[in-house]
């Protein structure tokens, strides 16, 4: 990358440790949830390596030394290598660290405003992820029922909650048994994205699968969804907060069921798409999904061209 000034690597490197309370990257990361912290730390490490030809990471780079020519070069390099969504996420991390450097009086106002004056990369318009079909969901659940045992029963409960609750995997791993009201199907999300509280509802079918799981888990206080070893022994603790365990669980079930690859987040896309297809207004779906705006919810709509085709057919010619 000739346009990145690798000769400046030494100038951008911290020459002595900085207290975490005065390190812009550390201050920024401390404001995030555990799951977001891991993702953004990875982004900052990548940016630091890019700027210094691999010599620095997020904590050894002196972010206060960055100027517009550095950030503009980072944007160009990321745009060439990565998808627009990933690039923009990394640019958010870059801007936020520079903001903390400014707040900590490590960079003057003029240099700061120039350095963060980099625009997002425009997307291609192609939607990420997909919605699952009814047949695929049935195959996933059938795979669990046919296998039997504690792991399969737990997995069926996980799939039921993701499918009918439309929640994020990070929200799922934080659920306590007290968050679920089996009588009403209410599932309380105490701390969703952005620290938001909301209530979602499970269908009777989903409740039945969760009840089957609770019969072997027991009603002891603690994590609603727990790890189970190969011997069927249940450990009453939460999965890791980043939700990686749920990702692996879903991936394994998809392979066993012969279902084309999808992510846990695709259950949210399916949830939103199906509710919109049933005629629910976008604001109700937004509340259930815990989105900040209906515009975000609209991006989750995977009903495809058939929706538009049917809408036009309902028009009267005159």
Regions found by a protein language model. Name each.
Residues 1-318:
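Conserved catalytic core of the tyrosine transesterase superfamily
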């Amino acid at each position: 990358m000739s346009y990145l000034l690798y000769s400046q690597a030494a100038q951008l490197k911290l020459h002595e440790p900085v207290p975490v309370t005065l390190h812009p990257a550390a201050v920024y990361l401390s404001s995030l949830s555990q799951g977001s912290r891991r993702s953004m730390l990875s982004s900052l490490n990548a940016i630091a390596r890019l700027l210094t030809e691999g010599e620095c990471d997020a904590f050894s780079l002196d972010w206060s030394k960055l100027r517009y020519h550095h950030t503009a070069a980072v944007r160009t390099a990321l745009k060439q290598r990565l998808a627009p969504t990933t690039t923009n996420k990394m640019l958010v991390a870059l801007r936020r660290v520079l903001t903390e450097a400014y707040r900590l009086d490590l960079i003057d106002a003029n240099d700061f405003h120039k350095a963060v004056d980099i625009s997002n990369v425009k997307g291609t318009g192609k939607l990420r992820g997909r919605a699952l079909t009814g047949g695929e969901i049935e195959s996933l659940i059938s795979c669990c029922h046919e296998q039997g045992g504690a792991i399969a029963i737990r997995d069926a409960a996980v799939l039921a909650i993701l499918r009918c609750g439309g929640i994020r995997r990070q929200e799922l791993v934080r659920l306590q048994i007290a968050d679920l009201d089996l009588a009403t199907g209410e599932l309380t999300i105490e701390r969703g994205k952005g620290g938001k509280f909301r209530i979602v509802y499970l269908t009777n079918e989903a409740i039945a699968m969760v009840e089957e799981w609770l019969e072997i888990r027991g009603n002891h206080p603690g994590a609603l969804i727990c790890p189970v070893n190969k011997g069927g022994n249940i450990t009453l603790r939460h999965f890791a907060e980043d939700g990686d365990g749920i990702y692996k669980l879903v991936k394994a079930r998809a392979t066993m069921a012969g279902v084309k690859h999808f992510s846990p987040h695709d259950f949210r896309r399916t949830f939103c798409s199906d509710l919109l297809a049933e005629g629910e207004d976008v604001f109700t779906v937004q509340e259930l999904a815990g989105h900040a705006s209906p515009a975000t919810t609209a991006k989750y709509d995977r009903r495809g061209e058939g929706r538009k085709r049917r809408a036009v057919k309902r028009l009267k010619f005159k």
